[in-house]
Amino acid sequence: MDNITIRDIKVFVTAPRGINLVIVKVETSEPELFGYGCATFTWRHKAVVTAIEEYLCPMLKGRSVHNIEDIWQTMMGSSYWRNGPILNNAISGVDEALWDIKGKLAGMPLYSLLGGKAREGVTVYRHADGGCLEEVKECISRYIEEGYRHIRCHMGTYGGNFDGRRQQMVKPEGAPEGAYFHPKMYMDSVIRLFEQVRKDFGWELEVMHDVHERLSLADTLAFTKELEPFKLFFLEDSLAPDQVGYYKYMREQTAVPFAMGELFTNPAEWKTIIQNQWIDFIRVHLSDIGGITPAVKLAHFCDAYGVRTAWHGPNDLSPIGMCAQMHLDLNSHNFGIQEFSGFTQEEEAVFPGCPKIRDGYAYVDDTPGIGVGFDEKEAAKYPAVDMDHSWLFARLPDGTAVRP
């Protein structure tokens, strides 16, 4: 079957969780052979769909499905300017689908194509959140009962709710609406949160926290030092992508492990901090860097410098995308941990073959390819939705916009 070519590329948008997911189907010259990939950029899903349907599909029809590397390089250079999240997600959908096809042709799961297993299960972590300390503690207790040993702890989502004190902030007259937060109140509430978590749950539980790039450089360093006594597994995304050079100074002044990369889209953003070993975990979102092909290269690059993987695994990632990451987790020598947001019953109906979770480990089966299917009829029950973007509009108490 050496002459198999791309016959067509189709794109689906479905929202079984109330979050828009973009799924790519690459059909081949063999009628029963096709592959699925994740191209989910939730906040710009229409732009991703257009990029695939209007640009990538016409360009790729008739090309051999075997030449994944050449196809990836061709897609990346096809618009001259490159490495933006819209194009990268479009590329990822095709790239993952081609790897899915290659696995089906070989009769092997993706992790075998990559070199086989380095471990039998994938350690995952969950998010514990709540509007107050008691709600967060209840969430942590529930996850511990389910067997999870790594939990990311927040109170009131990103920026916190300061134990209900958010309403104490006074905005200037005429200030726009947005997700207002007070840096000092936020930092204080997180310190109190971890004091209580360690008091109630001890030191065997591995805990994390995500700053979500919302603090100034000086506040970030001070906050990190305050967190040091709580022995976090890692502190996530302390700095914005255009400020990562500051990790040099943070590394010199604290022993807190750093995870970074959720917003990265190109190698220039991660190269220096990995080579200088300023971070401990790389946290990129696979589809935002272009899929499996660049992620494998990134994992190997990190391995040479002692940096472990902790791929971004939010709820706006399809089960196909999540499973693709878990195949890399099984294969990569330098795997650290996998973020996991769970699957709803609706998602499991749309995406048959979702990985199974037992006692804090994820397991993928030996189905050839990525291993997660896509029920097009079931997906049609959950059309695209208009999503609430308000949490993206972070603002300081005086109304100043804050961007991650």
From Swiss-Prot:
TM spans (from-to): none
Function summary: Has no detectable activity with D-mannonate and with a panel of 70 other acid sugars (in vitro), in spite of the conservation of the residues that are expected to be important for catalytic activity and cofactor binding. May have evolved a divergent function.
Matches recorded under PANTHER family: D-GALACTONATE DEHYDRATASE-RELATED (PTHR48080), STARVATION-SENSING PROTEIN RSPA (PTHR48080:SF6)
Family: Belongs to the mandelate racemase/muconate lactonizing enzyme family. GalD subfamily.
Species: Enterocloster bolteae (strain ATCC BAA-613 / DSM 15670 / CCUG 46953 / JCM 12243 / WAL 16351) (Clostridium bolteae)
Residues annotated for D-arabinonate binding in this entry: 212, 262, 283, 312, 339
Taxonomic superkingdom: Bacteria
Residues holding Mg(2+): 210, 236, 262
GO biological process: amino acid catabolic process
UniProtKB keywords: Magnesium, Metal-binding
InterPro entries linked: DgoD-like, Enolase-like_C_sf, Enolase-like_N, Enolase_C-like, Mandel_Rmase/mucon_lact_enz_CS, Mandelate_racemase_C, Mandelate_racemase_N_dom
GO molecular function, one term: magnesium ion binding
Protein name listed in UniProt: D-galactonate dehydratase family member CLOBOL_02770
